[in-house]
Amino acid sequence: MLTVDFARLGLQPGDRVLDLGCGAGRHAYEAMRLGGRVVAFDVDAAAVKDTAVVMEACDGDGAAVNGDALRLPFPDGAFDRVVAAEVLEHIPGDTVVIAELSRVLRPGGVLAVTVPRWGPELANWALSDEYHTVPGGHIRIYRASALASRLSDAGLVVEGRGYAHGLHAPYWWLRCLVGVGNDSHPLVRAYHEVLCWDIERRPVVSGVTRALDAALTPFIGKSLVLYARQP
């Protein structure tokens, strides 16, 4: 499940790519598939270890690195493309992280940043205190204009905006209503199965879910994506 549109990111074979906050590695693997030389970076050592195992089994050039986004261990201009997906909403020092992302992006390079979209995320916070008080969880909600201003303040030129995951916003509203940790609720289980069918591109079902996702995403897509260039 990709949040970033790699066509808009403009990744070319041989590009040096940083996936900051890689988590399970979904964007890192796609960047490798497209021929990028990828560094998957995360503060979670266990996630980095798991991602490294998958990378070793894949064709391509990839490495997984454990570290702190506030102090990236890379030289200035080290990367042609940078992805930071669903990361900034977790970090108190978000402006420091953005400055680091700008620093390691070469002139002419492109950054894709994704965060939870303001409207759907605001609904989650309103429906459940548990959703946003969990340790390591979301500590802020971004308006698109505020995030764009932070990127501009770091010297980047915002060139585009997108949204993703229209089917996922209602899923999280449901989870907030029945209890964020209540994975066994029958409605949650049924909805999750539908999302899995969509991700797995099951015949017939995925055609319906993708049509629904395309219709819903402009209005309630769970994620906001901004694309910015280093001048």
Show where each model-derived region lies.
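Short, glycine-/aromatic-enriched active-site segment of Class I SAM-dependent methyltransferases
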Residues: 113-140, 148-149
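Conserved N-terminal segment of class I S-adenosyl-L-methionine
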Residues: 1-75, 81-85, 95-98, 139, ...
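A short glycine-rich, Lys/Arg-flanked "PGG" loop and its adjoining helix->strand segment in the class I
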Residues: 95-110
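A short hydrophobic/small-residue beta-strand
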Residues: 38, 111-112
